[in-house]
Amino acid sequence: MFVKKGDKVRVIAGKDKGVEAVVLKAFPKINKVVVEGVAIVKKHQKPNNENPQGAIVEKEAPIHVSNVQVLDKNGVAGRVGYKVVDGKKVRYNKKSGEVLD
């Protein structure tokens, strides 16, 4: 998967299209990522010791990795490629050529 935790991404599809934010979690097995402030859902929690009345909590839901595009340091969105630099495999932005790792 081309997106990692901590990457700055732009959402390119869905109700939050155009939002630029940071990836909080990545789930490579299911090709999904959790992006800060994107795909907010309301989760109903049962009463417990911490919250005796229960609550409705808002949290980020995972979105498919195909709906995001990685940004480089200059904010240029592009596809991600891989190349070997000094014996290490690194990710780079195919549009700008800038190394992401």
Swiss-Prot record:
Gene Ontology terms describing biological process: translation
InterPro entries: KOW, Rib_uL2_dom2, Ribosomal_uL24, Ribosomal_uL24_CS, Ribosomal_uL24_KOW, Translation_prot_SH3-like_sf
One Gene Ontology cellular component annotation held by this UniProt entry: ribonucleoprotein complex
Organism: Streptococcus mutans serotype c (strain ATCC 700610 / UA159)
PROSITE patterns documented for this protein: RIBOSOMAL_L24
Pfam families: KOW, ribosomal_L24
UniProt entry keywords in alphabetical sequence: Ribonucleoprotein, Ribosomal protein, RNA-binding, rRNA-binding
HAMAP family: Ribosomal_uL24_B
Function summary: One of two assembly initiator proteins, it binds directly to the 5'-end of the 23S rRNA, where it nucleates assembly of the 50S subunit. One of the proteins that surrounds the polypeptide exit tunnel on the outside of the subunit.
Family: Belongs to the universal ribosomal protein uL24 family.
GO MF terms held by the record: rRNA binding; structural constituent of ribosome
Quaternary state and interactors: Part of the 50S ribosomal subunit.
Record's protein name: Large ribosomal subunit protein uL24
Segments passing through the bilayer: none
